[in-house]
């Protein structure tokens, strides 16, 4: 029985106000990301100061983090799609190298990527 094979991919983490959650998830759908995870009501401190979670209020009033694992060739279209949002509103995107064992769950990279 052989071991698992790992395949290089990119992990995207986008932190935005909850009111922009749909913008980000629709963009991920548009670029054919195979899926994403949303973590709501997050707290933290950044360029615009301290952001506190609002567990008792609307999720649109708090920060959310949307995470996805995609082939490297999808990073630039995601960044391009987020550019108009980040020009008007606060938010941040992190990109990390990751390795996945089930590449078929995340989409394959195209040749040359």
Each language-model region and where it sits:
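Positively charged, small/polar-rich N-terminal and surface patches that mediate targeting and assembly
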Residues: 1-113
């Amino acid at each position: 029985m052989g071991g698992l094979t790992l395949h290089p991919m990119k992990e995207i983490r986008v932190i935005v106000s909850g009111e922009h959650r749909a913008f980000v998830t629709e963009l991920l759908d548009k670029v054919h990301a195979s899926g994403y995870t949303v973590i709501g009501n997050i707290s933290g401190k950044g360029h615009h100061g301290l952001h506190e979670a609002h567990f008792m209020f609307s999720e649109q009033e708090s920060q959310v983090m949307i995470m996805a694992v995609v082939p490297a060739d999808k990073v630039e279209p995601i960044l391009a799609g987020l550019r108009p949002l980040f020009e008007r509103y606060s938010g941040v995107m992190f990109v990390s190298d990751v390795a996945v064992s089930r590449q078929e769950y995340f989409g394959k990279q195209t040749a040359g990527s």
